[in-house]
């Protein structure tokens, strides 16, 4: 779904009479959804198996894409739905990495994680290819439905292939709320990356 809005905005901008400013905000809604959902969804992987966060997030992305196809009629509805798709990405990329971290030993992790991280770029390229093809041969509604189906397919694949893994709790550290970011803000080394 990554490339659905960037490609189809050319058709939707005149259809919905959107200004360039509005088009930019709809585009940005994806990343706003991503930024706000990332700390929540990634933080939840400390308490819950990342597999379930991933599957839940593919559902969020699918709801956003299907919502776009069926309800988007202008700026607000498009921005809301596209923001949901961005939130879905937040719960698939890093939790997907956590799925591997929790299931691989150090040796396999070092060998396989570069392939996982490069898959994002490959997937983005494929998204532009598929959406470009749909741009030529289908309407925007069909493209967003296809994007939603793709998200559901990813969730079903992970559900079928990845075995559940209990989260290892560190017994010597106190259990904190997943949205309590104070420990990160107090960690100077971590703040350099934030």
Language-model region placement:
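Cytoplasmic helix-loop-helix junction between adjacent transmembrane helices
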Residues: 82-118
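Juxtamembrane intracellular "pre-TM" segments in multi-pass secondary transporters
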Residues: 166-193
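Extracytoplasmic
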Residues: 1-14, 18
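Helix-loop-helix hairpin linking two adjacent transmembrane segments in secondary transporters
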Residues: 116-162
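Residue-level signature of mid-helix packing/kink "hotspots" within the transmembrane helices
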Residues: 3, 31-39, 124-125
